A protein has these predicted regions:
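Acidic, metal-associated active-site segment
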Residues: 86-102
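Phosphate- and divalent-cation-binding pockets in alpha/beta enzyme and binding domains
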Residues: 44, 73, 113-114
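Short, hinge-like loop/turn segments at secondary-structure boundaries
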Residues: 51-56, 81-82, 121-123
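Acidic catalytic patch
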Residues: 61-82, 90, 94, 108
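Short, well-structured N-terminal submotif of metal-dependent ribonuclease cores
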Residues: 1-37, 43-59
Length: 127
């Protein structure tokens, strides 16, 4: 299994006990793959310490800070994209493209449009 990058849709699915998301997550951990969650994704989803399922998911993930070079690369993705998916989706796409990860997402159209804008392709798992 390649690496995984989670977007906001994946974290929301975890909160909602989506069995598809939890199956992907457990399979990744069993294979020694630690999913990546860009920090902006946490900002979009986290609201309080009472989100037990979100906390459980994040305990088995690596939160990736947004470095200046990554922020600029995500901005380039936005500038070349045919739609306006937003800065957080751009940071998810940049993060996954940099490592060759598969993106676990509720909105594959946004992620794929960002990659297409720079003539790249990202594999996605729709949740």
């Amino acid at each position: 299994m390649t690496g995984l990058t989670y977007d906001s849709g994946a974290l929301i699915a975890a909160e909602r006990k989506d069995p598809r998301l939890w199956a992907v997550h457990k399979r990744a951990l069993a294979r020694g793959v630690l999913p990546i969650v860009p920090a902006g994704v946490v900002t979009e989803v986290y609201r309080s310490g009472r989100q037990a399922r979100l906390a459980q998911l994040l305990a088995g993930c690596q939160i990736e800070p947004l470095a200046e070079t990554s922020a600029k690369a995500a901005g380039v993705l936005l500038g070349r994209c045919s739609i306006d998916p937003g800065a957080v989706d751009a940071s998810v796409a940049e993060s996954a493209l940099r490592r060759g990860d598969c993106v676990v997402t509720g909105n594959p159209e946004h992620i794929q449009a960002l990659a297409t804008g720079v003539n790249r392709k990202l594999d996605v798992i729709r949740i």
